[in-house]
Each structure stands twice: as C-alpha cells, then as structure tokens.
C-alpha cells in the first residue's frame, strides 16, 4: 500500500495529539482548543473514506505531529507522553479482542452521533457523555491509565470529563492505527520513518 507510512503517521499523530492534550488539561485545566475540537470530532467519524478524513486537514494535527517528532523523549514530560501512548495502545489491543465491548462502543458512539442533531459536541453535557463512554466501556477492560498533573486541576469534574473524552479519542485513533496496518513493530523499527513523514507534513502546514 503506497500510502501506508502516510496513513500510519496520520493515525499515530492522532493518538499523540490526544495524549498531549491530556497532559495539558491535567496540568493546566485548559488546552489547545482547535486541537481539542479535532480530537473530539475524530471519535464520531466512524466511517471515513480515508485516514485523513477522521481529522479534517493535516494542519488540524499540528500538535500531534509536533508531539510525534519531538515530544517522545527522555524528559519527564516525554516519559509521561510515552507512558500514556503505551497504556492506550495496550488498552486498544485488549478492546480489539472483546467483541462485546467493541459492539457496545459502536452503539454508544452512534448514540452520540444522534445527540449531535440537538447538541453541540463541545457542550459540557456532551463532553460528559463522551467521558462516560470511556468510563463504562473502556475502563473496565483495564488496566487503568494513571493520569498525572496538578491535583487541584484534576479534582475538578469538568477536567476529569475532558481527560476521559480525550482518552476515548486516543483509543479511537489507536483503532484507526491498527486498521491502517499499524503494529507494535512499527513503533520499534519504523518510528524513524514516521518522524520523517511527520516532519514533511509539518513543513507544509
């Protein structure tokens, strides 16, 4: 498949964007609003004609592409990003082996799509609904992802909802990554190629 590396890079940047936003919300209580919008919209794009359609445009993955290129390193922040990525991808692997959970996830996302006829995706109630999907469907599969940040920030319900909604987006992107042929070996042996592809994409944004 000629576009395999492109598709894998786009999907992996989607996961990176979700975890970078989790890190921002957990520390500060706010995050890049455009990137947040892209990540949440990705959850409801369940029947795309191509990989990029899940996110809209390459420019809407700028945060994720930047994270892919320079955010996964040995600094405390980079180690945290790596931990979130590994945890999300391990959860997705467990999810993919659970037909019941996959079916439930599909049903719940369809319900969100129907609610979009009446509500904005970024209303507090809708973010809460997305968070509850993560809590009800993904969390029980385990193990739980330990999110670290500012305690006073993480104690606020609205921030907890944002974090869980973003983790759900990360799972959705991990599903996409697998659908376009992404495998664990690509993270070990093919990361350099993804970084090169991400640098090309960033240069033209």
From Swiss-Prot:
Keyword annotations: Cell inner membrane, Cell membrane, Cytoplasm, Membrane
Cell compartments where the protein resides: Cytoplasm; Cell inner membrane
Alphabetized InterPro entries for the sequence: HflD (IPR007451), HflD-like_sf (IPR035932)
One Gene Ontology cellular component: cytoplasm
Main localization (coarse): cytoplasm
Keyword Cytoplasm: yes
UniProt key word Cell membrane: yes
SUPFAM superfamilies, alphabetized: YcfC-like
Membrane topology: Peripheral membrane protein
Pfam families, sorted: DUF489
Family designation: Belongs to the HflD family.
Name listed for the protein in its UniProt record: High frequency lysogenization protein HflD homolog
Lineage, top ranks: Bacteria, Pseudomonadati, Pseudomonadota, Gammaproteobacteria, Vibrionales
Gene name in the database record: hflD
């Amino acid at each position: 498949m000629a576009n395999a590396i492109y598709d894998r890079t786009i999907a992996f940047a989607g996961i990176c964007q979700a975890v970078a936003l989790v890190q921002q919300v957990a520390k500060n209580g706010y995050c890049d609003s455009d990137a947040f919008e892209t990540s949440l919209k990705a959850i409801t794009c369940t029947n795309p004609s191509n990989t990029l359609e899940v996110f809209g445009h390459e420019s809407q993955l700028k945060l994720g592409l930047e994270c892919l290129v320079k955010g996964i390193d040995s600094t405390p922040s980079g180690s945290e990003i790596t931990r979130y990525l590994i945890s999300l991808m391990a959860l997705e692997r467990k999810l993919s082996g659970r037909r019941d959970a996959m079916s439930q996830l599909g049903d719940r996302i369809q319900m969100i799509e129907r609610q979009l006829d009446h509500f904005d995706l970024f209303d507090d109630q809708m973010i809460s609904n997305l968070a509850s999907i993560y809590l009800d469907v993904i969390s029980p599969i385990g193990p739980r992802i330990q999110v670290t940040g500012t305690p006073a920030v993480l104690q606020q319900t609205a921030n907890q909802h944002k974090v869980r909604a973003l983790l759900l987006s990360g799972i959705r992107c991990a599903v996409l990554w697998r659908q376009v042929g992404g495998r664990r070996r690509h993270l070990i042996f093919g990361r350099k190629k993804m970084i090169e592809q991400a640098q090309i994409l960033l240069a033209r944004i």
